[in-house]
């Protein structure tokens, strides 16, 4: 029996196709397999992902762009590969995930390309500050916020 598609499936497929030319091709992003997604992020659930490399703040960096199952209604995530040792950089989780937004942050599902571009820019800015040691005080602020 053929798989039925919901409106959300169609929106996901449409949003991914919109990312192809302006972002994924430009970054020369390599698709991640479902096995890679489950292996690298066993405590999280992503529907699709891509890996790309670049120089950020003078450091060769590999990032994963990760789309949740309910993208474009939920923002994408970015993961640093390989994950740094814990507490190396502020706003980087143990599995390398970058903390760019608070949980439940609203995104515009009609603008998936703009959402990804903005979060990619935020990821680059965070890593530039981290590599330069400019945001080490954020550890203290994060600790105090809990």
Predicted stretch roles:
Residues 1-52, 63:
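Long, charged/polar, low-complexity intrinsically disordered N-terminal extensions
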Residues 2-19, 77, 83-144:
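Glycine-centered motif in EGF-like
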Residues 32, 36-103, 113-114:
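Compact alpha/beta protein-protein interaction domains typified by the UBC
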